[in-house]
C-alpha cells in the first residue's frame, strides 16, 4: 500500500504527522516540511536504532498534547511501558548498541537462573527504559521498495513504530459463530467451523477537520543496512 501511495499522499501524511515522526537523529535538522522524500534523504548510514534514539522517541511521544500517546500499560510500581516494533536489521542494531548492552549486562538479575531471561544469552524481546523492543521479521521481508534506497547515498531505511494505547484497532463486523457440516452419507462426513468478520488497522484522528493524525503511534525512519 505504501508503494502505491503517490508522492503527494506521502507529503500529506508527513505534514499531518510532523509532530510524531523522527527522521534519523533529529526532526529540526532532518525534517523537510511537506516533503517526505526530501526528509528521508537526510538519513545517513550512521543513524541507526540506539538506546539514545529510543529515549528521544519516548520523550517526544509523551510530550505530545493532542492526540496524546499514552503508555499501553502501567505496572504496579507506577512504571509506564511502551512497545517498539522494528524489523530484523533495526533489532540487530539495538542489540549491538552499547547503552542497551550495558543495561543487560549490569542491571539484570543474576540469581535464580536470571540468565535465562537475559537477551544476551537467549532469544526474545529487549527491554530498555520502559520500552519493550520487539522484532517483527515481516517489517524487513515486506519492506516497501521505496525505502530500500530512500536515504542519503541510497541508504536503506526502515520505519520503527513506538506504540502506546490504541495504536491499532480490532473491529468486529460479525462475532464468531459456529457452523456445522453434516452429510447423509451414513454420517461419515462431519465438520465444524467458525464464521466471523473482522478487520485490523491503525487509527487516525481528524484534528481541526484538517490534519489526519495517527493515534497512539510515534514513527521513526532510521537507517537499516541489510547484512544478508
Placement of each model-derived feature along the sequence:
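Sequence/fold signature of self-assembling virion shell proteins
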Residues: 22-71, 78-83, 89-228
Amino acid at each position: 500500500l505504501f508503494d502505491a501511495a503517490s508522492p503527494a499522499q506521502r507529503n500529506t501524511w508527513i505534514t499531518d504527522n510532523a509532530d510524531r515522526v523522527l527522521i534519523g537523529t533529529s526532526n529540526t535538522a532532518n525534517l523537510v516540511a511537506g516533503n517526505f522524500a526530501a526528509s528521508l534523504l537526510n538519513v545517513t548510514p550512521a543513524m541507526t536504532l540506539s538506546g539514545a534514539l529510543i529515549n528521544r522517541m519516548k520523550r517526544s511521544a509523551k510530550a505530545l498534547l493532542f492526540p496524546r500517546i499514552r503508555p499501553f500499560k502501567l505496572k504496579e510500581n507506577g512504571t509506564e511501558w511502551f512497545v517498539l516494533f522494528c524489523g530484523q536489521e533495526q533489532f540487530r542494531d539495538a542489540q549491538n548498541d552499547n547503552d542497551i548492552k550495558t543495561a543487560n549486562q549490569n542491571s539484570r538479575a543474576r540469581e535464580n537462573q536470571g540468565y535465562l531471561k537475559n537477551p544476551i544469552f537467549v532469544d526474545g524481546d529487549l527491554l530498555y527504559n520502559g520500552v519493550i523492543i520487539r522484532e517483527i521479521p515481516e517489517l524487513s521481508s515486506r519492506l516497501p521498495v521505496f525505502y530500500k534506497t530512500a536515504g542519503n547515498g541510497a541508504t536503506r531505511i526502515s520505519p520503527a513504530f513506538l506504540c502506546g494505547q490504541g495504536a491499532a484497532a480490532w473491529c468486529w463486523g460479525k462475532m464468531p459463530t459456529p457452523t456445522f457440516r453434516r452429510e447423509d452419507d451414513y454420517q461419515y462426513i462431519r465438520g465444524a467451523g467458525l464464521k466471523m468478520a473482522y478487520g485490523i488497522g491503525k487509527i487516525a484522528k481528524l484534528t481541526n477537520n484538517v490534519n489526519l493524525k495517527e493515534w497512539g503511534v510515534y514513527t521513526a525512519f532510521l537507517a537499516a543496512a541489510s547484512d544478508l
